[in-house]
Amino acid sequence: MSRTCQITRKKPMNGNKRSHAMNATKRWFIPNIHSHRFWIENKKKFIKLRISTKGIRLVDKLGIEQFLSIVSFKNKKNY
């Protein structure tokens, strides 16, 4: 499964872990992805998304219908 948020498009990025002596060691910064079910009122069913915690907060604030239109539009553009 992909480690990409379906709403915010966050994905893993790499960087350096720094020790006290400032030695650099490569590491991955992985987004906080959860599987979450959302209730779609007009379709009367749940949908399941792999979404970051920031994406969950955005959906709670603005509504799931707005984000579904964005995701379907981006999927048509060969995401």
UniProtKB/Swiss-Prot annotation:
GO terms for biological process: translation. It holds the Pfam family Ribosomal_L28. GO terms for cellular component: ribonucleoprotein complex; ribosome. Coiled coil: none annotated. SUPFAM superfamilies: L28p-like (SSF143800). It comes from the Bacteria. One of its GO terms (molecular function) is structural constituent of ribosome. Keywords: Ribonucleoprotein, Ribosomal protein. HAMAP family: Ribosomal_bL28. Belongs to the bacterial ribosomal protein bL28 family. This is Large ribosomal subunit protein bL28.
